[in-house]
Amino acid sequence: MKAWIWFTFVACLFAASTEAASNLVCYYDSSSYTREGLGKLLNPDLEIALQFCSHLVYGYAGLRGENLQAYSMNENLDIYKHQFSEVTSLKRKYPHLKVLLSVGGDHDIDPDHPNKYIDLLEGEKVRQIGFIRSAYDLVKTYGFDGLDLAYQFPKNKPRKVHGDLGLAWKSIKKLFTGDFIVDPHAALHKEQFTALVRDVKDSLRADGFLLSLTVLPNVNSTWYFDIPALNGLVDFVNLATFDFLTPARNPEEADYSAPIYHPDGSKDRLAHLNADFQVEYWLSQGFPSNKINLGVATYGNAWKLTKDSGLEGVPVVPETSGPAPEGFQSQKPGLLSYAEICGKLSNPQNQFLKGNESPLRRVSDPTKRFGGIAYRPVDGQITEGIWVSYDDPDSASNKAAYARVKNLGGVALFDLSYDDFRGQCSGDKYPILRAIKYRL
């Protein structure tokens, strides 16, 4: 009898350990379908990734500014060319896969209605019902398994460098608040968002649809999320624990964009600009660890260096000059896909190039805490300096290991189109995705 009890106990422990870190949530930016050149991700390319993903988040539907209803931001692709249906139909080939439609994200830019997501929270009930019904209709009509809310809230103001004077006070002041208050009505918006999520969940419950929440980069969870209340409303939360510093937000200094842990504090780094702080905060509020997915980016943030940035490349790097030029694949200044980054590192094809074509110097992270760095300083021959903070397969694997140690639900990958989906780096397609899957 004692042997049987011991066997049962061990079996339960094993089941619990295998249940944790089982999610690999893959974000799919459908705008990659319309890119030109090597960044164009077609459905056959997408399908290769699905064997590794537990969930696919289709991005992005938007919020129509005029009536605050959910809608496809590219109806020609999503509806008339049947991309919604083409992607959800892949579940027949990959029956383990759940496909969710994401509303919001940082793609939904509307200069005429810049505050529309807050307007929805503050709006009349009839407008909120219109949003909920329109979102439900998209999910139901096109065969999605649920809805993801990548809700837009005001972001923390960018970090600023301060001298030693007043440093201790500023660190305490910013610990939970960011640099400055950006929303004087945040407490009210927190209540309103919880009520909206509750109503969305009620609309999805009868069909058994999933509801997830994406916490976008630099959104302060203490301001906007009633975490204990959300626990009973969402199936899981994806924390976008990256882009803590970017060349757009921090044009004059470069630093780690997505460290797991807080780097040394001697350079006035804020305590909350790392993945562990964000995870620990959600856990401290009673949110179950197995409902948290750790966000990992498949791209790097790239700053333009100047002659005053120095030659060593050790962060914090001063006197940078905003975003580096866009890459051939990502086509966004200051952002390089992993395929673009690995192509710039030293290899047999570029190791003898000089000047502005010379390869980047890779700086490894023996601590496995902060992620990779690569740079090319400005010197006598080089006028186009660049400094990149990024995750490669090794550092992404370290983050998957962190998720396991913390008993998290898994990892959320942002996104498939910036991984090396063509296998240009090592011959393996989706090397970051694979590295995470093999470590979970």
UniProtKB/Swiss-Prot annotation:
One of its GO terms (biological process) is negative regulation of apoptotic process. Residues 22-440 form the GH18 domain. Primarily expressed in yolk cells and fat body. In larvae, it is expressed in the imaginal ring and weakly expressed in imaginal disks. More strongly expressed than Idgf1 and Idgf3. SMART domains: Glyco_18 (SM00636). Glycosylated. It is found in: Secreted. Its main location: secreted. One of its GO terms (cellular component) is extracellular region. GO terms for molecular function: chitin binding; imaginal disc growth factor receptor binding. Keywords: Developmental protein, Disulfide bond, Glycoprotein, Secreted, Signal. Disulfide bonds join 26-53, 342-425. Glycans are attached at residue 220. It comes from the Eukaryota. Residues 1-20 form the signal peptide. Lacks the typical Glu active site in position 152 that is replaced by a Gln residue, preventing the hydrolase activity. Its precise function remains unclear. Belongs to the glycosyl hydrolase 18 family. IDGF subfamily. PANTHER family: CHITINASE, CHITINASE-LIKE PROTEIN IDGF1-RELATED. Cooperates with insulin-like peptides to stimulate the proliferation, polarization and motility of imaginal disk cells. May act by stabilizing the binding of insulin-like peptides to its receptor through a simultaneous interaction with both molecules to form a multiprotein signaling complex. This is Chitinase-like protein Idgf2. It comes from Drosophila melanogaster (Fruit fly). The gene is Idgf2.
